[in-house]
Amino acid sequence: MMCGAPSATQPATAEIQAIADKVKSQLEEKENKTFPVFKAVEFKSQVVAGRNLFIKVQVDDDDFVHLRVFESLPHENKPLTLSSYQTNKSRHDELTYF
């Protein structure tokens, strides 16, 4: 993977689901609602001074959100940050940089 270029879209893994779960409360606070369903479906990663993860998350039968999560470098010891998100996405909406 090239520094700065997002990876190809990949199926979500247990690690990606765990990351999505860790920022779920940040999204719920920003949206002022709870998401009983929160299933990571696919993701892209981008190496920066740390790592950006673009994660497609299913929040209802036909409703998805796209998350951009920043993971700092290990020696910085900082928590995961929900940098940005997009709501009202469908299963077929492509994950792109936002």
UniProtKB/Swiss-Prot annotation:
Site (Reactive site): G4
Name recorded for this polypeptide: Cystatin-B
Modified residues (N-acetylmethionine): M1
GO BP, one annotated term: adult locomotory behavior
SUPFAM superfamilies: Cystatin/monellin (SSF54403)
Organism for this UniProt entry: Sus scrofa (Pig)
Entry's family note: Belongs to the cystatin family.
Compartments it resides in: Cytoplasm
InterPro entries attached to this UniProt entry: Cystatin_dom (IPR000010), Cystatin_sf (IPR046350), Prot_inh_cystat_CS (IPR018073), Prot_inh_stefin (IPR001713)
Membrane-spanning segments: none
GO cellular component: cytosol; extracellular space; nucleolus
Pfam families: Cystatin (PF00031)
Keywords: Acetylation, Cytoplasm, Protease inhibitor, Thiol protease inhibitor
Gene Ontology molecular function terms on file: cysteine-type endopeptidase inhibitor activity; protease binding
Chain segments annotated as coiled-coil in the UniProt record: none
Biological function: This is an intracellular thiol proteinase inhibitor.
Positions of short motif Secondary area of contact: 46-50
